[in-house]
Amino acid sequence: MAEAGGVIPTLSPARVLSDRGAILEWYRTHRAALSGHGVWTLGNEPNVQPFALWASARLRVLVARLSTYRDVAASMSHALVGQIAREVEGVYVDYAYLPPPRNYDLMRRFGVPLWLGTTTKQGPLAFDVLGISNSISAELLNLPNLLLESGVPLFKAERMSRPDVPLVILGGANSAQTAILHGEWDRGRAFLVDAVIVGEAEVAFRRFLQVVLEGKGRGLTKQEIL
């Protein structure tokens, strides 16, 4: 959608920290100021891979929720997606959640990605795939800001042109009801996600990760993999 006069607003991604050491230092310094003393950032939950496996992974996947940890911690959906991904040889998985609203300013002030891997303390730009789990349509209102404030461009063409940006895919119970994410925002400017996975994750998501691994191994670009 264009503004009055046909001027396209600038929607540039935020400049975020990419150095894990700097993010860890921020975390150690400010954890007590986070909601619930940062319980939503602790990571290392049961069945989560240890960070020691990060370096040897051939494909790194961040499973991201559009709701807060408090709201979805008991959900089985992202845990199942993570388990499916872990079963693909060479894949490392971490999880990220919508931060509690009162933590936004603290994270933005220091350039910490709003989507932050709870175990790795890495933002989406450190991963190969950003897998967004969408349960209900209302959650999608959080998507543009979470992308931008995590350093991820909104437009597919820019994401495809930058090797440091992960493939952005969306799945989940609501994935078949996401027409708002499809099509072009302006001529030549596809919007928000690179692909939507519809169907049983046990089959579709596993196969997607296998295709990405194969493509990476052959030196294909993200666009060629898609």
Question: How would you describe each model-predicted region?
Answer:
Residues 58-63, 67, 92:
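Residues that mark the start of a beta-strand
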Residues 1-39, 88:
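Helix-enriched interaction subdomains in cytosolic or periplasmic regions
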Residues 46-52, 75-87:
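Histidine-anchored nucleotide/phosphate-binding helix
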Residues 36, 40-46, 63-64, 87, ...:
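SAM-dependent nucleic-acid methyltransferase catalytic core
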Residues 68-76:
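A short, glycine/small-residue-rich beta-strand->loop->alpha-helix junction that serves as a flexible
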Residues 100, 111-226:
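Glycine-rich beta-alpha loop elements in corrinoid/cobalamin-binding modules
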